[in-house]
A protein has these predicted regions:
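N-terminal cationic-hydrophobic initiation segments that often serve targeting/anchoring roles
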Residues: 44, 70, 166, 244, ...
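Short conserved AdoMet
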Residues: 171, 218, 300, 399, ...
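N-terminal alpha/beta PP-like core and its mobile active-site loop of ThDP/TPP-dependent enzymes
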Residues: 2-349, 469, 478-481, 502, ...
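A glycine-rich phosphate-binding loop feature that marks nucleotide/adenosyl-phosphate handling sites
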Residues: 177-182, 409-411, 564-566
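Phosphate/pyrophosphate-binding active-site segments
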Residues: 1-4, 150-153, 302-405, 508-511, ...
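Active-site diphosphate/adenylate-binding microenvironment
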Residues: 10-20, 31-40, 362-448
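Thiamine diphosphate
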Residues: 116-129, 277-279, 320-321, 328-329, ...
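Active-site flanking residues adjacent to catalytic metal/cofactor-binding acidic residues
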Residues: 286, 308-310, 406, 456-457, ...
Length: 569
């Protein structure tokens, strides 16, 4: 009997994940996990390599961890959950991953297929209640592929396909269901035992399309680059910095989910596109589903729009207008390299134009810096604490390469961000709860770097804080959690005011459905999990409390600051 035939499919499944470079399985187990648990228990006596398995007591945290882990490491993680109910708990975070093009393998058990006749047949009443006609339907709109492992199939082949699809551009999550009987059955040997890079090679942009884009940008008096996440790959961040500097093209990181251009770069013109969009006669958009809000940010008449990305039409979005003059499909890092080369020819002899633009943009940047500095000075003594002052204090104390995971906690325009993969913004899906688990995943990917999870109080509720603090302690992943606590659902309040600026709700002393008082002592939640916790209510308390928090984290103790902040707007 061969080794492949002697071992269970569950063992083959775990081995193949490790063979393909998966380092972590983030798991929330149920009765469907019996073969997986048996496989893990057998492993110490074998020479088979498995990914490290981490227990995460809530599915939302587990998927958010995988999300944050990929954003910092560039590697996919696997999340395993309990049948239909675990999948349902994971779907919110799965939506976030899908809209953020994050490859995650979400694996779920399937209630046993058989009532009798197999050691893994149904033996609990829930095994009838948890079955669905179409379990994959829970996820189908937000995954690239879903499949159920079947009897007689090599687990290796299914793992390979899952990883390849997830890691092919545009990247995204996949869903795999794993029946208990199939996992317990003897493994089927793979047809081919090859290991190669994950995913299909990314498409290279059309040379002719890039040449046309260069012609449009070189003819413009005031070209502009907008991006949300092109800097997710550090090499693309380097290319963008070189292109923007060489041709004096300003960059606005609208709806930033990653830091794509260092905030100290001379062509970094902030994160709000409003003013520059009104002036730009050519706009190049890289990796941005919503580069501006059409009803709020009018474009200059006759402005030319060029959109770059692996899917510049964002075909997974049901409706998205954003009409463009040119759509360039391909990997954006490659597009930047090609565009820089094309512009070097198109802009030859245009030194005066470039340098004139550079001077004007230098003045605009200095004005932007002065405005931020003046605003910090104006608000630094205000009580409750202004979020911009909180960001300013954080800048003064954090490590240069610290990773900030920001979910409605801090104004990104107030942060100093100069290192690749140092900023993780929220997904456009808007599923609250990403910030906490995302911070753990970032720390798992880069244990040597400081990780700061900045969340609103509403986001903290949704982040399943007990599960978060448990994993932080159990896995020795000390993060600094900052809660910007305005005691309200601020986004809900602001949305109501935007739609009904003169309405009854806007004029009311207390708007329905937004108040979160009486607020808990969130810092005590961290203390209950052996962390450091402190409440901050005045500006004078902030810097000393931040220092104590950083001291705790740097010594290996998770820390949480509960900061009472202003209701903005």
């Amino acid at each position: 009997m061969t080794d492949s035939a002697a071992r269970m499919t569950a063992e083959s499944f775990l081995s193949r994940l490790a063979d393909r470079g998966v380092e972590y399985v983030l798991a929330n187990a149920g009765t469907d996990f019996a073969p997986i648990i048996e496989a893990l228990s057998r492993n110490p006596g074998s020479n088979r390599k498995y990914p490290r398995v981490i227990t995460v007591p809530h599915e939302n945290v587990a998927v958010a961890m995988a999300h944050g882990y990929y954003r910092v490491s560039g590697k996919p993680a696997v999340v395993m959950v309990h049948v239909t109910v675990g999948t349902a708990n994971a779907v919110c975070a799965l939506m976030n991953a899908a809209r953020d093009n994050v490859p995650i393998i979400l694996g779920a058990g399937r209630t046993p297929l058989t009532e009798t006749g197999h050691a893994a047949s149904r033996n609990r009443s829930i095994h009838w209640g948890q079955e669905m006609f179409d379990q994959g339907g829970l996820t189908r709109e937000f995954v690239k592929w879903d499949y159920e492992l079947r009897a007689g199939q090599p687990a290796d082949s299914v793992v390979d396909r899952a990883l390849d699809i997830a890691m092919s551009e545009p990247r995204g999550p996949v869903y795999l269901t794993l029946p208990r009987e199939v996992l317990a059955d003897p493994a089927v040997p793979p047809r081919r035992d090859t290991v190669r890079p994950l995913g299909a090679s990314p498409a290279v942009p059309s040379f002719a399309a890039v040449e046309l884009a260069a012609a449009i940008l070189s003819a413009a008096e005031f070209p502009l680059i907008l991006t949300s996440s092109v800097g997710r790959k550090p090499e693309a961040m380097t290319e963008l910095a070189a292109l923007a500097d060489e041709f004096a093209i300003p960059v606005v990181q609208s709806e930033a989910r990653d830091i794509s251009l260092p905030t100290d770069h001379p062509m970094c013109l902030g994160f709000d596109p409003s003013a520059l969009l009104a002036m730009a006669d050519a706009v190049a958009v890289f990796d941005s589903a919503v580069p501006w809000i059409p009803r709020l940010h009018p474009l200059k008449q006759d402005a030319k729009i060029i959109c770059f990305g692996p899917d510049p039409l964002f075909t997974r979005y049901p409706f998205r207008e954003f009409e463009a003059d040119l759509l360039v499909t391909g990997e954006s890092g490659a597009a930047l390299t090609m565009l820089r080369e094309s512009l070097s020819h198109a802009m030859r002899g245009r030194v005066a134009t470039i340098e004139g633009r550079r001077r004007a943009l230098g003045e605009a940047r200095q004005q932007m810096i002065a405005r931020r500095k003046n605003l910090v000075e104006q608000v630094k003594d205000q009580t409750p604490i202004h979020p911009l002052y909180l960001a300013s204090c954080l800048n003064a104390l954090k490590a240069k390469d610290a990773i900030i995971v920001n979910e409605l906690g801090l104004p990104v325009g107030g942060l100093d961000l100069t290192t690749p993969r140092s900023y993780l913004g929220s997904s456009l899906a808007g599923g609250l709860g990403f910030g906490l688990g995302g911070g753990l995943g970032a720390k798992l990917a880069a244990p040597e770097r400081e990780v700061i999870a900045a969340v609103g109080d509403g986001s903290y509720y949704f982040g399943n804080p007990l599960a978060y603090h448990y994993v932080s302690r159990a896995e020795k992943l000390p993060t600094l959690t900052i809660i910007a606590n305005n005691h309200a659902w601020h986004a809900v309040r602001q949305a109501t005011r935007d739609v009904y600026p003169d309405g009854h709700a806007s004029k009311a002393n207390a708007m329905p459905l937004v108040d979160l008082n009486p607020a808990p002592d969130f810092e005590k939640v961290a203390e209950s999990c052996a962390g450091f916790g402190e409440k901050v209510t005045t500006p004078e308390q902030l810097m000393p409390a931040l220092r104590r928090s950083f001291d705790a984290v740097r010594s290996g103790t998770p820390a949480l600051l509960n900061v009472t902040t202003q209701n903005r707007g």
